[in-house]
């Protein structure tokens, strides 16, 4: 068993004030104890001095697109790029996240499921990386936000089919585009894209197979359509109003 004691700096455990004069004992990559440093006065194993720093839990980033590197024009950055190269970029971005203190990410839309093998490799411990949840293809309407890389579906039956396709491909959650967005030409971010009926069909099918769901939703009407359908989380929510907030609070929507 390999053990390491981290001591000297502050500790933030996510539940209250900074802990001072405490130490963290790690055995085989598992935190075994967090206690006042005096408790470990007789410790004979490896020590790491964290003086001047703060230890804290890993951060979960709930909305990433691992195929991109934060470019101003993300679509152009992968257009015409070999799928193998894109997969390597996904792995690089995942590993950079972990090196930055992000221990879990939720990928909310990738490219032809190239992120799935990276997810599996990182989650299994085969490669260094964070825990990854991945949605697969974003489900969107014809001409809607995300249509260039997403799964286009129109009407309730087609939306249900699209959800089933993502589940079959191995998606951890379902991503549905409720409104327009700023990265798609000639699309108004405030416009509702899917109708209330279409949103309900997609979210209900996700729930039927025990999947959480996320909705790109910026305009108030689209946000309400998603919330009333039972969506797990609203992504962005730029133009939400008090009615949207009240509905989210009532339903426990993130």
What are these regions (language model features)?
Residues 65-86, 95-98, 128, 136, ...:
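Active-site gating loops and adjacent loop-to-helix segments of metal-dependent hydrolytic enzymes
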Residues 143-200, 232:
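Active-site gating/metal-coordination segments in enzymes
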Residues 53-124, 197, 229:
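Metal-associated gating/positioning segment near the N- to mid-region
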Residues 89-115, 128-140, 171-184, 212, ...:
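Divalent metal-dependent hydrolysis catalytic cores, especially in the metallo-beta-lactamase
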Residues 9, 24, 29, 52, ...:
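Divalent metal-coordination and catalytic microenvironments
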Residues 86-94, 154-166, 218-222:
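Short, acidic/polar
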Residues 2-5, 11-56:
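Histidine-rich, glycine-flanked metal-binding segment
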Residues 180-254:
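Active-site core of metal-dependent hydrolases
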């Amino acid at each position: 068993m390999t053990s390491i004691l981290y001591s000297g700096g502050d500790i933030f455990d996510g539940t209250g004030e900074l802990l001072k004069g405490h130490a963290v004992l790690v055995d085989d990559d598992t935190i075994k104890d967090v206690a006042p440093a005096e408790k470990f006065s007789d410790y004979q194993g490896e020590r790491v001095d964290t003086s001047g720093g703060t230890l804290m839990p890993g951060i979960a980033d709930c909305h990433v697109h691992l195929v991109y590197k934060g470019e101003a024009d993300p679509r152009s950055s992968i257009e015409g790029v070999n799928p193998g190269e894109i997969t390597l970029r996904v792995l690089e971005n995942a590993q950079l996240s972990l090196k930055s203190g992000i221990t879990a990410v939720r990928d909310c839309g990738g490219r032809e499921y190239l992120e799935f093998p990276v997810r599996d490799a990182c989650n299994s411990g085969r490669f260094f990386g964070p825990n990854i949840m991945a949605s697969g293809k974003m489900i969107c309407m014809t001409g809607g936000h995300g249509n260039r890389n997403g799964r286009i579906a129109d009407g309730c039956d087609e939306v249900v089919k699209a959800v089933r396709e993502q589940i079959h491909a191995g998606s951890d959650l379902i991503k549905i585009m409720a409104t327009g967005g700023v990265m798609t030409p000639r699309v108004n971010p405030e416009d509702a894209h899917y109708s209330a009926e279409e949103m309900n069909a997609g979210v209900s099918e996700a729930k039927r197979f025990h999947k959480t769901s996320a909705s790109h939703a910026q305009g108030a009407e689209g946000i309400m359509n998603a919330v009333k359908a039972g969506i797990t989380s609203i992504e962005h929510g730029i133009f939400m109003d008090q009615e949207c907030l009240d509905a989210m609070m009532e339903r426990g929507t993130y």
